[in-house]
Amino acid sequence: MKFIDEASIRVEAGDGGSGCVSFRREKYVPDGGPDGGDGGDGGSVFLQADENYNTLIDYRFERFHMAERGSNGRGRDCTGHGGVDLILKVPVGTRAVDDETQELIGDLTAHGQKLLVAKGGFHGLGNTRFKSSTNRAPRQKTLGTPGEVRSLRLELLLLADVGLLGMPNAGKSTFIRAVSRATPKVADYPFTTLVPNLGVVNPRPGQSFVIADIPGLIEGASDGAGLGIRFLKHLERCRVLLHILDIDPIDGSSPAEAAKAIVAELEKYSPKLAAKPRWLVFNKTDLMLEEDLQERVDAIVAEMDWQGDVYTMSAFNRIGTKELSLKLLDYIASLPPIDDSIDPDSEVEFKWDNYHEANTDSVNEDYNDDFDDDFDDDDYDVEVIYQR
């Protein structure tokens, strides 16, 4: 199945049902009073994370989604039934953004998690609600409010502990094949990897972490060169980044300059992503003599002015990959757990906070119920005239 990590959709919640004007009329009950029921609430639209989904391709072809409208109220105090909620299944790791306001609505990071993206309209009131000691036969009602309408941008961000980044043909896909059972395509030409790949690494029995491989970056990627930087978003949730360098590029280019270009593209995309823990990993060390290897590594590190962790490996021959996997496992285990809980005291102002209150007045502005204040049933009775 084709991997699609972005989709734009339009969601419409159901309108609320209108109230009913009705009166109880039975034999021997001439003054039964009002019995108009309320309308039903409109159905809401939810996103729900499902681990059985791994792409947003369905929403590329089906863009409009509408929940059910609430039914109108009826006589005998019958309340209209509420509209059925619409639940849209999305992959775990999906982020929902309002296309108009660019506000982040929420992230779905766990299987079964639900997110309200469009709230159904409120129900209208029947005339029973307006009965009072001075108004025994009210003839007013209210209409249901419209449901919320949103244009959403869905973004799928892969959930991984370790992210791989580097130039094309640095050996990222070869590394993920060496340490996991993932089988991304490997070839001797640039941009072999066209979509992100995930692999589960098991360095020790019962202990594992997830690693993500994204297409390679080149200088100018932020301006659209190569495959651009659109896949960098899949590294945003990673705990640590592995910056893989070809220690001896076949084209004679400088590994230090290549590394600086990658860092520059990271900073252009997101300073927060560029500030994540990053390890420098030199690959293809089997192509050099052992006595020249350390000297070459030291020279590149000095040219980069690198102060972080440095590792060497040969992903093709699986030399140093096991040790690196164990280091990653221990490092991830030492990090504090990610707190995904939401502060219940935090106040977040969304676009639709006052939506229903604002619409309640507008949808009912045509209803003038002043004539109800002095309404008397006797005014509508049959007039009997006696003559002598």
Swiss-Prot record:
One family name in Pfam for this protein: MMR_HSR1
GO cellular component: cytoplasm
Molecular function per GO: GTP binding; GTPase activity; magnesium ion binding
GTP-binding is among the record's keywords: yes
BP-aspect Gene Ontology terms: ribosome biogenesis
Localization, UniProt: Cytoplasm
Oligomer status and interactors: Monomer.
Protein name, entry field: GTPase Obg
